[in-house]
Amino acid sequence: MISSTRAKSSRRARTSATLLLGVWIWVLIDVIIADPARGATAGEVLKKIQSLAPAQRRTALEEGAKSEGQVVIYTSVSLSDYPKILAAFEQSYPYVKTNAFRSTPSGVVRRVDTEAKAGRHAVDIVASAPVETWQLRQLQLVTPYLSPERKALFKGSFDPEGYWTAFDVTPIVLAFNTKLVSQQEAPKNYQDLLLPKWKGKMSLGTEDYEWFGALLDLMGKDKGLDYMRALAKQNLHMPGSSSVMRVQLLLGGESAIAIAARGRRVAEFKSKGAPIDFRLFDPYAAEPDMLALMQHSTHPHAAILFYDWLLSQDGQSKMSDLTGRIAVRKGVRHLPWLQELLQKDFLFMTPAAKTLGTKEITDLYHGVFGLYGTKK
C-alpha cells in the first residue's frame, strides 16, 4: 500500500514538473517573439539606412529581413483580400514569412493597445482605417517613416510627418437594390435620404467615422450634427461595421439602401449582374487604408521591406490585379469594372483632413446613432 502511494505521488510529481516545464517553454517563446530588445528598433534601422544609396539600402533591408525571417501584420483589410496581398509579398521575398491578425479597425487598435500595456510588442505593421491609425499615433505606438516610394503616390495619400501612408483607397457610394428601388426614385443627394419613404429601409455601419467626419467638415459641425440626428430618426439598420456584410444584406432584401457603402465591392457585384447600383454624392468621399510602422517592431527590416513593397509599382499593381483594390500609386492600371468609380474626383478622407479630433468624432457618432448605450 505504501509502495503504491509512493508510486502515485511520484507520477503526480513528474506530471506537475512536465506541465510546469511546458508553461515555462511557452513563456520563453512568448518573450523571445515579443521582446523588442533582441535587435535594433525600427527607428535605429531607419537611421542606419537613411543615408544609403537605393541599391545599398535595399540590400541592407533584404539581409536584415532574411535574418528576422518574418513580419507580423495586424489588419482590418477584408478576409478575401489580405491573404492575396501577403502571398504576393512572399512570392517576391520567400525568405520572409507573413503572420497576420485580422479584426475590425477598432479591434486592431484594442489588441495593439492591450499588448503594449502588457509589455508585449508583437506587431510590426498595422494596415487599417484612418481614424484607428490616428488613434495608434495618439497612443505613441507608431514610429514616423517616409518611404521613398511616396514620391510616386497621389497627393494627399501620405502624412508629411510620416505617421501613415495610404496603400489603397475606397470611394464611398450610396448603394441600392434595383429590385426595390428604381433608377428614377433612387436618392440623388444626402437630403433625399431624409424623405419619409426611406424610413426603416436604409442601413449604415457602426464604425463609419471617416464618412461622418467628412460630412461634418463639409456642412459645419452644428448643421452637420442636425443632419445626422435627422438621419438617425430614419430608423437605420446598423448590423455591424462591415460594409461587405451590409451590401450582402441589401442584396438579400434586408434593406433597400446602404449609406456609405464601399464602392469597390458594390461595383464588383454590379459587374457580375447582381441587382445593385450606386450613386456618387457630393462630397464624393473616399476612405484610404493606411500603413503604420510600429515603434516597437521586432522585425524592423522585414517591416520596412513590406511597407516599401506594398507602395511600389510591383506591390500596387499586384494588389490591384489580385483584389480589385484601387491603388494610390500613379500609373497603376485598374480593372475595367472600377472605371465608373474613377470618373469623378473624390475627397481623400484622412485624419489630417478633418477639423474635429478623432475621439470627438467617434464619441459623436456613437451618441448620434445611439450605439453602445449612448444617445445625444
Q: Where do the PLM segments sit?
A:
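Extracytoplasmic ligand-binding site segments that recognize negatively charged/polar headgroups
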Residues: 72-87, 98-116, 120-254
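Extracellular/periplasmic bilobal clamshell ligand-binding domains
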Residues: 334-376
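Immediate post-signal peptide segment of exported/extracytoplasmic ligand-binding proteins
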Residues: 39-72, 91, 194-200
